């Protein structure tokens, strides 16, 4: 069965302000525009994630919300996961392999370096660091999400706000 995983780095965020935690950093105006751009591209490609799994950082939640608004999807499609804020590849893998197998298109919004490392681990492609708002599309030929692992995915495309 064909499944798709969309790995996205949150869009451009503001620098940390005095007294503000890193987790509370918000999107810049450019980050908001870029999230809408990527959401519009997904919409024109008729890509509608069954689920958006996102970090609980303000900038990741905002990116996910803007994608959802642009795709005209229901907010219950967002699943917040605090462990994705400072995640390792292992953490992402654990969360993805526990997904319901009724989901065929899953979008994860996270942070570098883990989101970039995960894309390279799953595809064995040299992708490099995802820029803010960057999105990697990975295709799997699997019946169960628990079957994903090193090199099990096929790199389909890298999308950035500058390329759409």
Short names for language-model regions:
Residues 84-100:
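Short phosphate-binding loop-to-helix
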């Amino acid at each position: 069965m064909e499944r798709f995983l969309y790995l996205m780095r949150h869009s451009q965020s503001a620098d940390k302000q005095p007294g503000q935690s890193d987790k509370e950093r918000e999107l810049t105006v450019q980050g908001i525009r870029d999230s809408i751009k990527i959401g519009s591209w997904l919409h024109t490609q008729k890509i509608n994630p069954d689920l958006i799994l996102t970090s609980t950082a303000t900038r990741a939640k905002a990116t996910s919300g803007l994608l959802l608004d642009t795709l005209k999807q229901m907010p219950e499609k967002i699943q917040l996961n605090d462990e994705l804020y400072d995640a390792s590849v292992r953490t992402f893998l654990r969360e993805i392999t526990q997904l319901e197998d009724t989901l065929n298109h899953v979008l994860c919004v996270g942070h570098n370096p883990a989101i970039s490392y995960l894309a390279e681990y799953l595809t064995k492609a040299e992708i490099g660091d995802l820029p803010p708002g960057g999105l990697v599309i990975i295709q799997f030929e699997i019946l169960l999400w628990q079957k994903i692992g090193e090199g099990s995915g096929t790199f389909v495309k890298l999308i950035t706000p500058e390329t759409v």
